[in-house]
Amino acid sequence: MNKDSTWPIELGTSGVLAPGRWLRLRSILWATFLSACAMAFFLSTQYLGAWLHLPPRSSYFIVLGIPLLAFIGYGVLISAAEGRKPVEVLPHTGMIAEISVGALLGFFMLCAVTALLWTLGLYHVQPNHWQHIFDSFVFNSYLSGMMEELMFRAILLRILGRAFGLRWGLVLSAGLFGIAHLSHGSWLAAVEITINAGLTMGLVYMATGRLWMSIGLHTAWISPKIPCWASTITTVCSKACRSPANPTYLPGGKFGPDASVLATFIGALAVAAIVY
């Protein structure tokens, strides 16, 4: 077991990640291969139904099932190539509790960000209608929470941490997480997401050594934003709309409150709470 002296995270020290010559190169190639596999699983959630000419309702089974298959596939590859138990993705007795704690953390973080923006007059809240909540959860929150945590935390953070040290693994994986969200907003939004989500979720994974709490945080961070506040998509219960008179970098633009410059304050508090 190779666990950092401070963080209970299994980095891997055998097989393809064994000490010795070309460790960094081997680590980068291994991370690239696993990331490509994870991306293949993700793309299959988007296109498998059309490729196989399946009925439209099959998309629910595809999106719910393929992330589970991705986790199983990851576990098989880790066992074979690294010669260890993939503890970061294995179910355990405290799994539900970890998911719940992560979900509460994500929910309250987004509540705090939205409340701050509302207090400063950058958002206004109005009633909305319940609709499409299950679809929003399955096709956005659940899918993103499972697949992005697998790729950016279990694969990139862990393996880059093995190659360059855990701090660099955290920073690099968080930066790549922000870059991956560039298509959703501006470069400034990507920087905010790097801090507010990338660092926070990475630290949660490092603090537990397992993905479940970070998956709960990730899922809850997305879930209420879409179905409850509808900061990017109008769907459910109450609607938080940014005031158009304010600069887009303050309320977060089209990506929503988690891309706000002011959300960095909440993200920094969360990071400090986890670290200290």
Segments the model singles out, each with a brief description of its role:
Residues 80-87, 110-126:
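Transmembrane alpha-helix boundary signature
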Residues 190-249:
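Functionally important transmembrane alpha-helices
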Residues 43-52, 117-123, 182:
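Juxtamembrane "helix-exit" motif on the non-cytosolic side of transmembrane helices
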